[in-house]
From Swiss-Prot:
Native organism: Crocosphaera subtropica (strain ATCC 51142 / BH68) (Cyanothece sp. (strain ATCC 51142))
Cofactor-binding details, from the entry: The D1/D2 heterodimer binds P680, chlorophylls that are the primary electron donor of PSII, and subsequent electron acceptors. It shares a non-heme iron and each subunit binds pheophytin, quinone, additional chlorophylls, carotenoids and lipids. D1 provides most of the ligands for the Mn4-Ca-O5 cluster of the oxygen-evolving complex (OEC). There is also a Cl(-1) ion associated with D1 and D2, which is required for oxygen evolution. The PSII complex binds additional chlorophylls, carotenoids and specific lipids.
Binding site for a quinone: H215, S264, F265
Cellular component, GO annotation: photosystem II; plasma membrane-derived thylakoid membrane
Protein name as annotated: Photosystem II protein D1
Binding-site positions, chlorophyll a ChlzD1: H118
């Protein structure tokens, strides 16, 4: 009997780390993008939670009128927000070391920049990590392509729009009511409801919801029965089974008769590509719309009302939007300027006569 002793190959600590980072056997895949994603998202989340709970008021308009957004300063979950950095800061990069003190940094809304920059880097890395894991597993790269839609939307409202408007104070506040306020002001200043790219985005989101519900209900209604009537149909599926779990021919026949033949897919791969592509392309268009409106390439304006033969205004939906936009613009930053640009006029306008 012969015993052979072989010297074990020594692996450096760096090589062990590389193998661990790129291993697909880990419970959660880390990846090289993950080494940057994890600290940035943890930093953004931690700062957001602390600022949402305890941040002092922020001078968002740069006119020495601070706006409180945290829970400890009188807000609730709905009204609370991380308030954007001050208009006095503009587009300047404003880390903690750029301020004279921590109090000054908080007063000028420094936490907002800290959160959004780390958040954006984190979601960019998350998208890269999706590609990286797909590559390691030999999969196609479409998962990260689909994820690029919400990434582009977040980049548009947190980075591109403030750059176009000249100040991070115009970025979207990090809160529920702050998001709604951002939407109202965006409509008032850019007429986004009349922008074709926004319309395509609405079609993408609502259409995607409709198609998802239609697909799920069709599949659920055409499952191949593998159980008795007293058992859940979910028990009829075994993870990894080779057999089809639903009858696509039956679903195709039902939907083709419900509408017409060519409205129904007879190819499962083409169907699922369509379900993925429709909302993604719609959200891409919305992000492009916000990015173009950031530089004031706004939605359609129908400022000239339709008049009848006597000169009376015939009200249209465009008139409703214009009037609502002016009203919202008047209420926005009401102490930062006297009148919105839409109301500024070289000629004096007499007040309307009130019929008493």
């Amino acid at each position: 009997m012969t015993t052979t002793l072989q010297q074990r190959e020594s692996v450096s600590l760096w090589e062990q780390f590389c193998q661990w980072v790129t291993s697909t056997n880990n419970r959660i895949y880390v990846g090289w993008f993950g080494t940057l994603m994890i600290p940035t998202l943890l930093t953004a989340t931690t700062c957001f939670i602390i600022a949402f709970i305890a941040a002092p008021p922020v001078d968002i308009d740069g006119i020495r009128e601070p706006v409180a957004g945290s829970l400890l300063y009188g807000n609730n979950i709905v009204s609370g927000a991380v308030v954007p950095s001050s208009n006095a800061i503009g587009l300047h990069f404003y880390p903690i070391w750029e301020a004279a003190s921590l109090d000054e940094w908080l007063y000028n809304g420094g936490p907002y920049q800290l959160v959004i920059f780390h958040f954006l880097i984190g979601i960019f890395c998350y998208m890269g990590r999706q590609w990286e894991l797909s590559y390691r597993l030999g999969m196609r790269p479409w998962i990260c392509v689909a994820y690029s839609a919400p990434v582009s939307a977040a980049t548009a409202v947190f980075l591109i729009y403030p750059i176009g408007q000249g100040s991070f104070s115009d970025g979207m506040p990090l809160g529920i009511s702050g998001t709604f306020n951002f939407m109202f002001v965006f409509q008032a200043e850019h007429n986004i409801l009349m922008h074709p790219f926004h319309m395509l985005g609405v079609a993408g989101v609502f259409g995607g919801s409709l198609f998802s519900a239609m697909h799920g209900s069709l599949v659920t209604s055409s499952l191949v029965r593998e159980t008795t009537e007293i058992e859940s149909q979910n028990y009829g599926y075994k993870f990894g089974q080779e057999e089809e779990t639903y009858n696509i021919v039956a679903a195709h026949g039902y939907f083709g008769r419900l509408i017409f033949q060519y409205a129904s897919f007879n190819n499962s791969r083409a169907l699922h590509f369509f379900l993925g592509a429709w909302p993604v392309i719609g959200i891409w268009f919305t992000a492009m719309g916000v990015s173009t409106m950031a530089f004031n390439l706004n939605g359609f304006n129908f400022n000239q009302s339709i008049l009848d033969s006597q000169g009376r205004v015939i009200g249209t939906w465009a008139d409703v939007l214009n009037r609502a936009g002016i009203g919202m613009e008047v209420m926005h930053e009401r102490n930062a300027h006297n009148f919105p640009l839409d109301l500024a006029s070289a000629e004096p306008v007499s007040a309307p006569v009130i019929n008493g």
